[in-house]
Amino acid sequence: MLWYIVAGAGGLLIGYLIANYQINQKLRKAKEDAQTIIEKAEKEANEIKKKAIIEGREEVHRLREEFEKERSRREEELRALEERLLKREELLTRKEENLEKREQQVEELKANLEEKMREVEEKEKRIDEELKRLAGMTVEEARELILEEARQRYEHDLAKLYKEMKEQVEEEAEKEAKKVIAFAVQRYAPDYVGEITVSTVSLPSDDMKGRIIGREGRNIRTFEKITGVDLIIDDTPEVVVLSCFNPLRREIARITLEKLVADGRIHPARIEEMYEKAKQEVEKAIKEAGQEATFKAGVMGLHPELVKLLGKLKYRTSYGQNVLNHSIEVALLAGYMASELGLNADKARRGGLLHDIGKAVDQELEGSHTTIGAELARRYGEKEDIINMILSHHGEEEPMTPEAVLVAAADALSAARPGARRESLENYIKRLMKLEEIAKSFKYVEKAYAIQAGREIRVIVEPDKVDDALAEKLAYDISKKIEEELEYPGVLKVVVIREKRSVAYAK
């Protein structure tokens, strides 16, 4: 009996040990399988990564080949244009030779006329003697009679010849001018996109709209105050709209908002930080835009400050037309026409590119954009003939050179193209600019921003010099001056903002 008990206990012990061993074997196998799966996943991930890198390199190579093809095509077009220009120059040379031949014919006609006059004088002498013999007239009386008859007869012929030649020359000159202008316009036929007063910023999700607004709207108020741009948030999915008549302020605001959305941290301090970074980016973009404009127009050797001012024109519009694109267009048109007429094309392009340079700062300085532009050009070393082109394209001075006339003509061509400018948008922008100018004319005003499509103006004042009572009076005075000097629909809200900041650092 005892032996059975011992045997049963031994069997149980052996069964336990075997079961424990099997469990340990299964655990070890499970760990090995898990390690194998992990290694396999890592291997597949590396293969996917390598494949993505290879595909990326292939895409870069493809894009590079497309770029080289496009560049080759553009170079071929340029060579074709140069060949056409050479042919036009040859045609112009032949026409000049024909004109010289006609001038020679005129000289020959003039010589023949003088010869006939001498023959008339000889006949007059013979007639004098005959009249004196036959009629008993004095020499003076006979001479006066003959001269009067000859004068009446030949003056009529000479006047008729002069009129015919004048009409012929004027007709040919008009035809040639039309050909020159048509050829210049055909050589430069750019695409044009009208400027608008809004920009859109895409959002990763509609949840971001709440973060942009902030607690009780503090973020959106800070953003609009710092940038001077309306931030419009509506039901449009994953999009917000920035509205401002000033393209420069709108671009800075767009970059600021995109940086905030990408960063994800949106609060007043972060808004100010991103705004400063956006301003630096736009300053860099302005410089690059100016350099690109000089390259497109083929103008070299400009002062760096003039290049920077050209870049600012990228963010200015005139009747809905971008001023920088307009300046490049005027430069190229003037250069083409100068080449056709055998004039200085480099000088014409330089004057055309700089003719509206004053518009880069005319909001900051007193005077017309032509006067301001001439002052800037003189300050940065431009020659008097270029300065004359700037002043004469709107008639403030008489053109000193043929190139100045071409710049004025190119300016008119660019502005008069159908669809190039829009009157209503320009009037709206001028009204908003006038609104800001009125607010800035008051003492202690630092900045002024017209927002809400001109229905509200926010005025930021110096906090150390304006208290609450003076702020209320300033708002009243500004509103009264706006009522006197501007016409506007509905009610216009004037908001005076004074903010005092004290900053200290704990070390």
From Swiss-Prot:
PROSITE patterns: HD, KH_TYPE_1. The chain crosses the membrane at residues 1-21. Its EC number is 3.1.-.-. Residues 323-416 form the HD domain. Keywords: Cell membrane, Endonuclease, Hydrolase, Membrane, Nuclease, RNA-binding, Transmembrane, Transmembrane helix. The keyword Plastid does not apply. InterPro entries: HD/PDEase_dom, HD_domain, HDIG_dom, KH_dom, KH_dom_type_1, KH_dom_type_1_sf, Ribonuclease_Y, RNase_Y_N. Pfam families: HD, KH_1, RNase_Y_N. It comes from the Bacteria. It is found in: Cell membrane. The keyword Plastid does not apply. It is an enzyme of class 3 (hydrolase). It is a single-pass membrane protein. Endoribonuclease that initiates mRNA decay. This is Ribonuclease Y.
